[in-house]
């Protein structure tokens, strides 16, 4: 599991990026967020996640809010 902070997330479009210390930003789609209800993230929020290879490069999977 990796940890990082949400750089930005657009709730209307359902995606954003997670900032990883010492690494490149990672794309995150709302479908990767674990939990019930409306799936969104707040800027600066700390999260844990796995990195998988997506269609456009690395992206976050199994995202949980810390």
UniProtKB/Swiss-Prot annotation:
<keyword id="KW-0238">DNA-binding</keyword>
<keyword id="KW-0010">Activator</keyword>
<dbReference type="InterPro" id="IPR002059">
    <property type="entry name" value="CSP_DNA-bd"/>
</dbReference>
<dbReference type="InterPro" id="IPR050181">
    <property type="entry name" value="Cold_shock_domain"/>
</dbReference>
<comment type="subunit">
    <text>Homodimer.</text>
</comment>
<feature type="domain" description="CSD">
    <location>
        <begin position="4"/>
        <end position="63"/>
    </location>
</feature>
<dbReference type="InterPro" id="IPR019844">
    <property type="entry name" value="CSD_CS"/>
</dbReference>
<keyword id="KW-0963">Cytoplasm</keyword>
<dbReference type="InterPro" id="IPR011129">
    <property type="entry name" value="CSD"/>
</dbReference>
<keyword id="KW-0805">Transcription regulation</keyword>
<dbReference type="InterPro" id="IPR012340">
    <property type="entry name" value="NA-bd_OB-fold"/>
</dbReference>
<protein>
    <recommendedName>
        <fullName>Cold shock-like protein CspD</fullName>
    </recommendedName>
</protein>
<keyword id="KW-0804">Transcription</keyword>
<dbReference type="Pfam" id="PF00313">
    <property type="entry name" value="CSD"/>
</dbReference>
<dbReference type="GO" id="GO:0003677">
    <property type="term" value="F:DNA binding"/>
</dbReference>
<dbReference type="GO" id="GO:0005737">
    <property type="term" value="C:cytoplasm"/>
</dbReference>
<dbReference type="InterPro" id="IPR012156">
    <property type="entry name" value="Cold_shock_CspA"/>
</dbReference>
